[in-house]
Amino acid sequence: MNYDFSRELRLLTPEDYKSVFKQAHRAGSPHFTILARENSLSHPRLGLAVPKKQIKTAVGRNKFKRITRESFRNKQHSLPAKDFVVIAKKSAQELSNEDFNKLLDKLWHRLSRPSRG
């Protein structure tokens, strides 16, 4: 199994993001929200939205992105073929790395279940 985070596993264009924002299933916490939408590919893809308004410092934004990408990279083979967008909230920077990963795992699992309706 390959655990890299190649270009094909990323949302790259504004159209990709728009389609997820338009019709998405949500899983959220006080620290961040994950939006998910089925895609027509055979693998999941990840997009990140980390506004400067929410996390002020570049160090904080980069940490958020790094931890989220690493979690996605490790879980990619157990995730369904969906496009995921992770949106940061202010309180995300207060989480320890361990708590951040636990919360991400919980939300990945919630979004991996078949949708009802």
UniProtKB/Swiss-Prot annotation:
GO terms for cellular component: ribonuclease P complex. Belongs to the RnpA family. RNaseP catalyzes the removal of the 5'-leader sequence from pre-tRNA to produce the mature 5'-terminus. It can also cleave other RNA substrates such as 4.5S RNA. The protein component plays an auxiliary but essential role in vivo by binding to the 5'-leader sequence and broadening the substrate specificity of the ribozyme. Disulfide bonds: none annotated. Its EC number is 3.1.26.5. It comes from Aliivibrio salmonicida (strain LFI1238) (Vibrio salmonicida (strain LFI1238)). Consists of a catalytic RNA component (M1 or rnpB) and a protein subunit. It is an enzyme of class 3 (hydrolase). Keywords: Endonuclease, Hydrolase, Nuclease, RNA-binding, tRNA processing. One of its GO terms (molecular function) is tRNA binding. It catalyses: Endonucleolytic cleavage of RNA, removing 5'-extranucleotides from tRNA precursor. InterPro entries: Ribosomal_Su5_D2-typ_SF, Ribsml_uS5_D2-typ_fold_subgr, RNase_P, RNase_P_CS. This is Ribonuclease P protein component. GO terms for biological process: tRNA 5'-leader removal. PROSITE patterns: RIBONUCLEASE_P (PS00648).
